[in-house]
Amino acid sequence: MGLYATCLSNGPPVLRDATVDSTLVSELQERIEEKRETITVVPGEGNVLGVWGYLGDLYAFRNKTGNVTAGMYKATSSGWTEIDLGLALNFDGTTGNGEMVIGSLLTGAGGAQGTVAGLTYYGNWDVGAEGTVVLSDVTGTFVTDETLSTPTISFDAGTVEILQGDTITGSTSGKTAVVKIITIASGGWATDDAAGYLSITGNTGTWTDGESILVYGAARADVDGATEPSSKTLAYAYGTQYAQTLQPGGKYDFVNFNFEGEEGIQTMYGANGIDNSFEFDGTNFTKIRTGITSADTPSYVEAYKNHLFLGYTNGSLISSSLQLPTIMSTTMGSTELIVGEGVTGLNVESKDSLAVFARNTTYILYGKSRDDWNLTTFYTGSGAVDGTVQKIHTTIFLDDRGLTSLGSTLNYGDFKQSIISEKVDPLIQKYKARIKTALRVREKNQYRLYFDDKTGIAMTFINGKNEGIMPFTMLDQIICACSTEDSNGDEVLYGGFDDGYVRRLDSGTSYDGGSVAAFVRLAYFHYGTPQLKKRFREILLELTADTSTTLNIYPDFNYGDGTVPTSTAYDITVTDDEWNVDDVSNSSLGIAVVDKARARIQGVGENMGILIKNTSIYDKPVTLQGAVIQYSDRGLKR
């Protein structure tokens, strides 16, 4: 330790030793501040409303200037870049001629055209659905009430079912296409007379009337028409095309999930309580319409059993169609469940179940689809404070009784609750109505709550057991936070703050350039003789440290009851240790693994406690391994 690599403008990197190069540390600190000055706020005004990681990139949401709409932004090397939410067109009056599919060309009766980039609807398409189509590469302007058409392939004489995702080939023409949706207009596969329409993408040309439609070389049906695929009316425009926007405000909840079953394909889903939920694939943004007429503004989103679940403050719990997160069609698996209370959290549990939290009740949803969904009341009188549900080894949430763990029992499908914050209950009760956000930290096995006065608590688990709760104070007010992964798959923590910045948590050595004040108070101890007075002479701290720093030591005697004079503060200089990861494999270390720092003290008492403090901007953390106290007995207390 103590060696840093620095890049010189006139040559390759060289090693410089901080122990002999007096300017290295100051130069390093200058570089840190130079980089800090390049960090910018998320554009707009007010709080950062949400922050989330998706496919190695970082996204944030904040109200735009004027608070009329909110914006979605992506972190780049040059700062925050606004995401274009795209053009959309509402539609109704769907027909039985096939469905719109992603990647197909949509044409309006007036000549406007655009490529379907996103699609959401509610109801059953063949009998009249309503929804929204997101369009890219638009030419012209779509207008209200005009017909909307897309090329589909008409077929008849269907004998073997054609499936979504099949690549079809014409037996005579040799043309190919990928099937996205199959619409049956008459007959059936079982009776060898299925007829209808194939909604396709990637078509390579005009097919021949009557030729066989092949899948893996086997005939499945025949082409019905001489100019297939032909443009057919699928729906009617309901209003003109418009630029999508986000409502201002809200509190965002997110989940990433792969509904397509292909490796590496995940999509971001979000909800904010004041607007439609949404889907984002890195390029295209689609607001999800469910058909709720009062307020289609879910607060929570979760993926479970290949359905997207949306939780509402009015007590509704809506699931999407199977593997179709933006489609709310009952014939394809969508349904609405009634919770009866406002949903305050959703979390997938380990035993094929979804935990649904309300403020005063906990529910468990079992099943795999709308055919067997079973929403059961798990606990009446115990629910989750809004926004506090997080999953570590078990699900942790804040209830009126305190921090609560929802863990599975040995019996399949059963759960148990246990309060895990009894020892700090006064603190929990003080802040339970002042929660800003909660965060899980997987690498440290921690659950954190952030309060509205720049303070919070961190609960650490070891082998599934709560080993302690530590309060902390921050220099800035956090509003939202997330635990995500970078492009290497490593966990990173981000917080969105009230000043518009997104800051990486548990990173660096300062509060964004501000000093970090840290302390630890060791318990008072009588060293086996509570009635015997002692003269305390020395404190020897066993430490590990990555950088040199100074610790302030404050010994305190007799529980601080004032019967003895207040002790003097002592300073201890800590030097960085020489241990590093390469030494793990050494058969003979030859270096000190733990550093020792001592302070000569003076004080008399029956017991002593120790307060250790440090304030720094650039010093790295110091780990206290132990403390050895030297003292001599003085006699019994009279």
Residue ranges and their predicted role:
Residues 73, 79-241:
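Autoprocessing Asn-cyclization modules and mimics
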Residues 1-86, 246-263, 380-394, 401, ...:
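Beta-sheet repeat architectures centered on beta-propellers
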Residues 266, 352-353, 491:
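Structural hallmark of WD40 beta-propellers
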Residues 76, 110, 173, 238, ...:
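Acidic/polar residues in short coil/turn loops that connect beta-strands
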Residues 144-147, 209-212, 287, 477, ...:
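Extracellular/lumenal ectodomain signal focusing on beta-strand-rich modules
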Residues 39-47, 84-87, 241-247, 284-439, ...:
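Beta-propeller and closely related beta-pinwheel folds
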Residues 62-64, 272, 312, 358, ...:
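Recurrent small/Gly-Pro-centered beta-turn motifs in extracellular repeat architectures
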Residues 258-288:
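Hydrophobic or amphipathic alpha-helical targeting/insertion segments
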